[in-house]
């Protein structure tokens, strides 16, 4: 514990020390997006487009049925967290499409 106040008792007692900061373990990087992975996924998305369930979810998001879209995606992808991430991704795509359309006009 670092000595914050010159006191002999209490939570702040003891010698002044520097915290030994260890770098994060390599096992913690699992699932982190790399530049290469991002490039490959973007390329595949450009070539293949969206899956039918993603297109339907986007239609639901267009008409502001966010909760219905979440339930629909959850049924397709399995877990609540994955469904939330997918819904967020699709809403970002829709926002980008809207922005591109506005810029075009």
Curated annotation (Swiss-Prot):
Cross-referenced PROSITE patterns: RIBOSOMAL_L36E (PS01190)
Q: Which UniProt keywords apply?
A: Acetylation, Cytoplasm, Ribonucleoprotein, Ribosomal protein
Among InterPro entries, the record links this protein to: Ribosomal_eL36 (IPR000509), Ribosomal_eL36_sf (IPR038097)
- Report the Gene3D superfamilies cross-referenced here: 60S ribosomal protein L36
Q: Which residues form the signal peptide?
A: none
Q: Which Pfam families match?
A: Ribosomal_L36e (PF01158)
GO terms (molecular function) for this protein are:
RNA binding; structural constituent of ribosome
- Where on the chain is N6-acetyllysine found, per UniProt? 62
The main location class comes to cytoplasm
| Cellular component terms (Gene Ontology) | cytoplasm; cytosol; cytosolic large ribosomal subunit; cytosolic ribosome; membrane; nucleolus; synapse
- Give the GO biological process terms: cytoplasmic translation; translation
Q: Quote the subcellular location field of this record.
A: Cytoplasm, Cytosol; Cytoplasm
Q: Which PANTHER family match?
A: 60S RIBOSOMAL PROTEIN L36 (PTHR10114)
Q: What does this protein do?
A: Component of the large ribosomal subunit. The ribosome is a large ribonucleoprotein complex responsible for the synthesis of proteins in the cell.
Assembly with partners or alone: Component of the large ribosomal subunit.
| Name of this chain's protein | Large ribosomal subunit protein eL36
Q: Which gene encodes it?
A: RPL36
């Amino acid at each position: 514990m670092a000595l914050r106040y010159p006191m002999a008792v209490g939570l702040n007692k003891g010698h002044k020390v520097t915290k030994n900061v260890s770098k994060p373990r390599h096992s913690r990087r699992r699932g982190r997006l790399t530049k290469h992975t991002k490039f490959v996924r973007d390329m595949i998305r450009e070539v293949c487009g969206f899956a039918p369930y993603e297109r339907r979810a986007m239609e639901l998001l267009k008409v502001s049925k966010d909760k219905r879209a979440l339930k629909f995606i959850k049924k397709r992808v399995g877990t609540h967290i994955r469904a939330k991430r997918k819904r967020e991704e699709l809403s970002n795509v829709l926002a980008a499409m809207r922005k591109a359309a506005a810029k075009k006009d």
